Amino acid sequence: MGKNDFLTPKAIANRIKAKGLQKLRWYCQMCQKQCRDENGFKCHCMSESHQRQMQVFGQNPTRVVDGYSEEFEQTFLDLMRRSHRFSRIAATVVYNEYINDRHHVHMNSTEWATLTEFIKHLGKTGKCKVEETPKGWFITYIDRDSETLFKERLKNKRVKSDLAEEEKQEREIQRQIERAAEKLNGGGGEGETSGNDEVVDDGDDERKKDEDLRLKSGVKVGFALGGGVKQVATGKERGESSKLLFGDEENDKVERGEKRKRSGDSGRSEKERRSALDELMKEEEKKKERMNRKDYWLFEGIIVKVMSKALAEKGYYKQKGVVKKVIDNYVGEIKMLDSKHVLRVDQKELETVLPQIGGMVKIVNGAYRGSNARLLGVDTEKFCAKVQIEKGVYDGRVIKSIEYEDICKLA
């Protein structure tokens, strides 16, 4: 039997074995000691040091397990970030690289019994993109480092500046509409005053004509001097004066007809003004619709319904969740309301949710995209709703008909 000296073959073999990986079931995580065989592990479990560590564990087992689980997850993700940051790789390959470090946190000390459970946890929490294939589980690291966050901030700044520019343009259009309305109203007022002046002038001309007719026809004109002597008109004079009076009545009728025509013209001009304003408003709505109508509609903070039949086995089909984050405009990180699990779902497999009447909604598409509004009513036959915008540039504006797909309940 070989001796156990320092340079003997047996001692060298033991040191080589100690450097390499040993069996996982003979490792004590609390004492961080690896045993070489079952007998050694049994002796270690009966030792005084191990018993003390087990007493510490018994005081708060949940905290100890959570601590090891957090350390295991963090170390695993650090390895993914360093070695496979932008690649899709098999989970077993990453795990084999991870356990090459003999001082790693062992999985039997965490809350996950198998690698599959741990990979599913990474997918639910949104830390990795998880995919199950016939060849096993594949994972892709989701980069959330400072560089990515910096790019996201720049992107958000660009979006905000674009929105501010759109608001400025809309305000300018609104001012132009108001100026056009004021000019139209001012022009109408001048026309009315000129019309009144013409009426007065016509009346003066008619009075002058009447006086000339009286002088030519020889009608006597009486002047009251001093005592105010009354002049008695003859029958002939009465007849002629009555003719003149009837002539004045006819002139009054003509004047009334002209006034009616002018009032009709002013009414028509008012209608024309209103129609012009309506046309301007419609043009503005169409322009906003063209600018803000997108093929993506996800926003953070809205409640959506999962309609993916592939997730029916997991119990997520037709379940509601809150959009916590939007990735590349089309994919949302959804935190389920019931299970609190986090999923990544494409917008094609999601559906908008309507609140009760009076609830708050987000306009997710169309002319007023991004505005918050209050639901006033629902038309089930036309599949549209009536909302009133709250806050922002369009505060108080009522949209009488907006499609269900363009609004979504706010969380």
UniProtKB/Swiss-Prot annotation:
Function comment: Promotes the copper deficiency response by direct interaction with SPL7. Acts with SPL7 in a common pathway to promote copper-responsive genes and alleviate oxidative stress during copper-limiting periods. May promote SPL7 function when copper is limiting. Participates in the control of general plant growth and development, and in the response to counteract the negative effects of UV radiation.
Homology family: Belongs to the KIN17 family.
Stretches assigned to coiled coil: 147-183, 265-294
Domain of life from the UniProt record: Eukaryota
Region (C-terminal subdomain A): 301-352
Designated gene of the protein: KIN17
Region (C-terminal subdomain B): 358-409
GO cellular component, one term: nuclear speck
Biological processes per GO annotation: cellular response to copper ion starvation; regulation of developmental growth
Organism: Arabidopsis thaliana
Name the UniProt record assigns to this protein: KIN17-like protein
